[in-house]
């Protein structure tokens, strides 16, 4: 009898102590899309962004990814025009962290290798000087037609500078506080039909 009790006690000890319970580990992430709806088919110039921007910090490069931001341009033709010019200029480009740190990121905008700046216009099309706009060339060909013409192209967006608190610049993005930055990147387009 003693052997049976001892055997049962040993089985209980082995089954109760040798097994560790693994805890489940879960992680969650949220994807957010900006959403608005607008239709304008009567304005002389309409520029529509085709998507939103999302920059992710990559630890391996200690920096943020760049993004291609596509846009659609529609113009109304002017049959009296002899030349057409389309330019762009950066208006806003600061993202601010959504906490109390005041940390900021500045977004750079590039069009076909040329920086789009706040201080001057970037020429995208200038038919009088032979700048026909690459992917926007349908506009250079249709600016003097009697109907509307559309074309699509894109900017390259990248994080070009940042601060830890709104004033202290960082040279190493790994020193930025953890969190999410939000804001608008706005580019103004100007079209000129010359008669």
From Swiss-Prot:
Family: Belongs to the EcpA/MatB fimbrillin family.
Keywords (A to Z) from UniProt: Fimbrium, Signal
Induction: Negatively regulated by H-NS. Positively regulated by IHF and EcpR. Induced by low temperature.
Summary of the knockout phenotype: Mutants do not express ECP and are defective in biofilm formation.
Pfam families: MatB
Compartment annotation: Fimbrium
Assembly notes: Self-associates. Forms filaments. Interacts with EcpD.
Source organism superkingdom: Bacteria
Disulfide bonds: none
Main location: other
Extent of the signal sequence: 1-22
Name this protein carries in UniProt: Common pilus major fimbrillin subunit EcpA
Function: Part of the ecpRABCDE operon, which encodes the E.coli common pilus (ECP). ECP is found in both commensal and pathogenic strains and plays a dual role in early-stage biofilm development and host cell recognition. Major subunit of the fimbria.
GO cellular component, one term: pilus
Cross-referenced InterPro entries: EcpA, Fimbrillin_EcpA_sf
